[in-house]
Amino acid sequence: MIDRRTLITALVAAPAMGALGTALSATTAHAADLYDSNTALYADPALVEGVDYGRRLRRHLVDDQDPAAAAAPVRTTVIAPHGGGIEGGTSELCLAIAGYSPAGPTDTAPAGPLHDFWMFEGLRSSGNSALHVTSTHFDDLTGRAMCAGSLNVVSLHGCTAAQAGLEAGAAAVLIGGLNATLRQYLAEEFAAAGIRAATATGDEEIAGVHPQNICNRSLLGAGAQLELTTELRAAMFAPGKNTRLDRAANTLPLFWSFTAAVRTAIQRLEATQPVR
């Protein structure tokens, strides 16, 4: 089983937010998972879907019936494999980055493009960390199929500053994954938004460089993984409202700045990709 062990980060963005530094000490990050796959978790008779955990998704119709006007492929899928109470704030960001209200999809389409999304959420009042399945062991059939049918995948995660090898209280996002172009665009957009960001290297779970990591199981075999520290995620929601039930209705400007930065990076990447 792979767990988070070593992380070294390099500064890539946002001087106004302070430098991360070019080298950070090794840290022990995430304890070994209780479940070695989603399949094992779903098979546990002690867990009840809809009570302990839930899954949400939206997959857009691709209808290619006209040989003279072929439909474009699914460009990007946004995922939160540890949403709800596991890594707080990632469900709401997943929805917003996909183009929806953080409270969930509605019949009214917002401005801008919509993306497919998938998320796994811890629904317990406590103890949700036991539901964490590391990204290289992700095998939910629907989630994996959605990623495999997309050109790009953006995967959202949460970590503590200590797990990231940062100073206490650091509000930052670590950019990982095998899509170097998307990583570059994300870094540039975070810098423009004044959000502290760094390229994640070293430990695979945070760096997201293993081919089996769900962020890289796209049509192109590469994607992006974003690890947001607890402090960065907390600053996105009103004080006292950073709970699973309250977050969606209590977002702060930083939430939307982060969302806009990721959406702009995705749009820049999609503009370079062929229609089909």
Explain the meaning of each model-derived region.
Residues 1-15:
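N-terminal secretory signal peptides and thylakoid transit peptides that target proteins
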Residues 11-275:
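N-terminal catalytic or cofactor-binding beta/alpha core of small enzyme domains
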